[in-house]
Amino acid sequence: MGQPTTTSLFMRDVMFHRMTGTSQAVNDVATLSGERREIIRRALNKKILVPNILELMPAWPSEFQPNIDEVNVEIDEWLKTVNVAKEKKLKHRARGNYTLLAGIYYPHCRKEKMLALSQFLYWIFFWDDEIDTGGELTEDREGTILCCAETNKCINDCLGPEPNYTPPPGSRGTVEMLYPILRDLRAGLSPVSTMRLKQELHDYVNGVKNQQKVRQEDHLPNPWDHFQMRVDDVGVIPSITQNEYAMDFTLPDWIRRHEAMEEIVLQCTKLTILLNEILSLQKEFRVSQLENLCLLFMNTYDMSIEQSIHKVLGLLKDHYKICIEAEARLPWSTTDEKLNNNIREYIRGCQRLATGTACWSYNCERYFKLSQLNDQQELLLDLSRT
């Protein structure tokens, strides 16, 4: 498929229909500010066909780790021991299959490393959903601050200079489960990579705390401010560092801090955010989580939802091009091929952050039903409230 244009996006409105059986959604809308209600009204019941996002990143293939099913057996046993509500565990296991996500992020890692990598992804989705729209802490500012403080303490305990892997008595389940996960990850990381992971996790946790505050405000944020906030705190950056754990190597810090590598990490982060804003739009819209670029461009620039999605797709193409161009500026060695291989592996890990998130979304029902995909992997987004 070629690059999408406005006309190549199949878009159609459907008639406004009665929301019988969706009284919860109606009640949710009634409590929102006028600005938020207006965005819902304008997007409600639209159906938009979105092109296969993987085709917008053609140089980056998707691969699958061969032991996903075997690791899932181990995950199912591990989940029984996790102090999280059974309903939440069942929901995430059925819809998310985060072992699949780990298997796409790290397709060439050894099977024994897959367990900790999969457990980390289960943790990040469990933890994030507590604070995200519809979670236990969505409206609880003090509870969110406390949860983030406990989580930051866990990160310091496990990844700091004097590691302590014992959770404090009374820790919430999503903090308690993180201690052994970080213990296992640290065992396979160099000191410099451990310090990077520590800072990246702090940035993520503090960013989620900031996002929760933004969602409580009456006015929707500017889309560019929202995009920058997501770049600053997005939880995918720790998954790049974990590629060093997965593939048994350490990237020297001077290479990680090289401007071209920083650019690649930044652009792959932006790509992951952009594609996720599109692929998660339906799910977020249905629970009135309106801090989504597709809806924020609508609000700020008086665009239709179709125009807004097209704009996000255009940004995705732009950032992909910037990322490709940055590879030519990397500090390749003329004598150390092992170092060059490690650089290549790190770059592939960055790229798989974007392609892996999209590929996983097309192979589970975290954000939409698989029946909404056609044979060309085009997605028919359904912005109804049912």
From Swiss-Prot:
Q: How is the cofactor bound?
A: Binds 3 Mg(2+) ions per monomer.
- Residue positions annotated to bind Mg(2+) 1 are 128
* Complexes and interactors: Homodimer.
Report the domain of life of the source organism: Eukaryota
What is the name attached to this protein's record?
Terpene cyclase 6
What InterPro entries does the record point to? Isoprenoid_synthase_dom_sf, Terpene_cyclase-like_2
* Reactions performed catalytically: (2E,6E)-farnesyl diphosphate + H2O = trichobrasilenol + diphosphate; (2E,6E)-farnesyl diphosphate = alpha-humulene + diphosphate; (2E,6E)-farnesyl diphosphate = (-)-(E)-beta-caryophyllene + diphosphate; (2E,6E)-farnesyl diphosphate = (E)-2-epi-beta-caryophyllene + diphosphate
Sequence similarity: Belongs to the terpene synthase family.
Q: Give the domain section of the comments.
A: The 2 conserved active-site motifs D(D/E)XX(D/E) and NSE are required for coordinating the divalent metal ions that stabilize the PPi moiety of the substrate. The C-terminal WxxxxxRY motif is frequently found in terpene synthases and is important to guide product formation.
Q: Which UniProt keywords apply?
A: Lyase, Magnesium, Metal-binding
For this entry, list what GO says about its biological process: isoprenoid biosynthetic process
Annotated function? Terpene cyclase that is able to convert FPP into a mixture of sesquiterpene hydrocarbons and alcohols. The main product is trichobrasilenol. Additionally, side products include alpha-humulene, caryophyllene, 2-epi-caryophyllene, african-3-ene, african-1-ene, isoafricanol and pristinol. Does not accept GPP, GGPP, and GFPP as substrates.
